[in-house]
Amino acid sequence: MPQTFYPSTFYAMQISHPVIDPQLLRSGAAQAVGVLKILANEDRLMLLCQLSQGEHCVGELQTELGISQPTLSQQLAVLRNECVVNTRREGKNIYYSVADARTLEILVLLHRLYCPEGKN
């Protein structure tokens, strides 16, 4: 679906903009960029969206998302190495969950901005 671009005046009329202090943002910019890089991969984004619903084991994630096992393992390793997910072992299963509430806030915002209304 092609995207429609609107002039900046359209956005000014539609959205009240919060005051963003660039100097304050600078102190957290590297961390913010790191999170955005992690979310910039579609498989990782979908994994985190699924995990935003609660804890899941690898088998559940593979079934629910349809991601191949090698890709799933690779992307979960990235999320673990970047401390974006927590892990918990129960028997032979490893369960994953989102580690940081800020990541959940970003996912909620992305869902609100990019997901059609009325669909989960």
Label each region the model flagged.
Residues 1-31, 103-120:
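Amphipathic alpha-helical dimerization/coiled-coil segments
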Residues 2, 77-78:
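Short glycine/proline-rich, acidic loop/turn segments that cap or connect secondary-structure elements
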Residues 33-36, 77, 107:
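Generic helix-packing signal
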Residues 53, 81-82:
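Residues at the C-terminal ends
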Residues 63, 74, 80-81:
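Alpha-helical residues within the helix-turn-helix
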